A protein has these predicted regions:
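Short, charge-rich amphipathic interface segments used for partner binding and complex assembly
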Residues: 26-74
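N-terminal acidic leader/helix
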Residues: 2-34, 71
Length: 79
């Protein structure tokens, strides 16, 4: 059973993670552009690869968040 307190704390954590993701993703994008303008292909590739890893992590977090939200809403309907 998902308590309302747990649900609220977990959703807050998801939203905090989402905000952190946006900051890091933007930073990595800027660094990749900077490396490209300097002609450093290896650095650009490294920044892009890390950015992709963060994107995959964010997708996983969003799926977990959606699943928790669906479970909580279903539980509320049954009560």
């Amino acid at each position: 059973m998902i308590t309302e307190d747990f649900y609220k704390k977990r959703m807050l954590q998801y939203y905090t993670d989402e905000e952190a993701f946006r900051i890091v993703y933007s930073f990595l994008e800027d660094k990749a552009k900077e490396a490209k303008s300097q002609g450093d292909k290896k650095k650009e590739q490294a920044y892009l690869e890390v950015r992709i890893l963060f994107l995959k992590r964010n997708i996983k977090i969003r799926k977990e968040m959606d699943q928790l939200k669906a479970q909580y809403e279903y539980q509320k309907k049954r009560e």
